[in-house]
Amino acid sequence: MTMALASSKAFSSIFNTLSPINQSKFVLACSGSNHVDVIDRRRRIMIFGSSLALTSSLLGSNQQRLPMESAIALEQFKEKEEELEEEEERNVNLFQKTSPSVVYIEAIELPKTSSGDILTDEENGKIEGTGSGFVWDKLGHIVTNYHVIAKLATDQFGLQRCKVSLVDAKGTRFSKEGKIVGLDPDNDLAVLKIETEGRELNPVVLGTSNDLRVGQSCFAIGNPYGYENTLTIGVVSGLGREIPSPNGKSISEAIQTDADINSGNSGGPLLDSYGHTIGVNTATFTRKGSGMSSGVNFAIPIDTVVRTVPYLIVYGTAYRDRF
């Protein structure tokens, strides 16, 4: 069908290139002298034959070139498609490997009875806020942001509870109460402890943050707005940033990223392309009143976390030092 169309256009092009004189001769020959008709017919046959030969040659070369160009384009498309599939597969594998280490944290306030007694049933409690965290070790230590559990940390009336939901190494989901082990408001870090009851947990694999480079890929996993196990992808946008801590001091060497960190992502891990934890997601700049990520987000560098968490696990934070 394509060749028929090409030949038709070629013939039309050939006919239209004839001069008005030749065209008028052709018309006159059809209506008059036989001598003129024969001469003009021979001349026209010669012109048509030469043009047709040229057209056939051009079409033949195009026929040879077009399939070759199409084959190259198709091969390039397949290569790009395979690259995309490989990248997607890497992202899927990274998420499947690391998400079992991420926990969902609910800050719960227990209700009081009319007589002032506290109801200890968490099912009747009010969820004051949600956040994220990650499994530090197989003993049940959980790392999160201080501001995620600040109400529990400063509770003087026994009204606050912390519920930690996660999966064990077998993929079984369970929830336990998180008890405070240690706090570091200066760096917006906290360590909780849950009872494992013989379950095997999935601790994160720790990376380093001192060798990060702007432009490298990074991945944030958390529970934004209560949507558990949400993955967002971006790059390291900046290094050595300074951000405020919950107590008004400054956290230095923060990692800036455009991977979305929304409300509920706080405390979750920031990962590199190998699935190693390189930071703790903690803050985002938002437009006033929107509460949504602006693409300027921050994480506490893992080197700071590695210096802080073991100390908190060993020495803890005395209750009197929380206020």
Curated annotation (Swiss-Prot):
Keyword Chloroplast: yes
Domain of life where this protein originates: Eukaryota
Location in or out of the cell: Plastid, Chloroplast thylakoid lumen
One GO CC term, this protein: chloroplast thylakoid lumen
Keywords: Chloroplast, Hydrolase, Plastid, Protease, Serine protease, Thylakoid, Transit peptide
Annotated family: Belongs to the peptidase S1C family.
PANTHER family named in the record: PEPTIDASE S12, PROTEASE DO-LIKE 5, CHLOROPLASTIC ISOFORM X1
Protein name (record): Protease Do-like 5, chloroplastic
